[in-house]
A protein has these predicted regions:
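Conserved functional hotspots at enzyme active or ligand-binding sites that engage polyanionic ligands
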Residues: 1-110
Length: 110
């Protein structure tokens, strides 16, 4: 697989996990650009879930016709090669902007 890119939805294994972190084989929204991901073998991403709970940092979207939430408060840096990330979809620019806005608020970025 070529390096994942910003806005890609990839499926990968989140285990091992600890505490309240998402676990198992699940989708994630890629937040870092392909150039970084290719060079480092890492990617910055937010896990996704079909269990929508209405939390303030969820961003609702659809992937393959399934409603799901991007968990923008659980941002991670993961080795996409070792975790065998597979691209399944791409989100809209609007969804990316919404997730980026949530991350800015969470991290108190200007």
């Amino acid at each position: 697989m070529k390096a994942p890119d910003v806005g890609d939805v990839v499926w990968l294994m989140f285990d091992p996990q600890a505490g309240h972190e998402q676990s198992g084989h699940r989708p994630a929204l890629v937040m870092s650009p392909a150039a970084y991901n290719h060079k480092t073998g890492l990617m910055v991403c937010c896990p996704m879930t079909s269990q929508i709970k209405g939390y303030p940092f969820e961003v609702i979207t659809q992937v393959d016709g399934v409603d799901c939430a991007v968990l923008s408060d659980q941002v991670k840096s993961l080795d996409w090669r070792v975790r065998r990330a597979k691209k399944k979809a791409t989100v809209s620019k609007e969804v990316m902007l919404h997730v980026q806005a949530k991350l800015k608020a969470l991290l108190s970025l200007p």
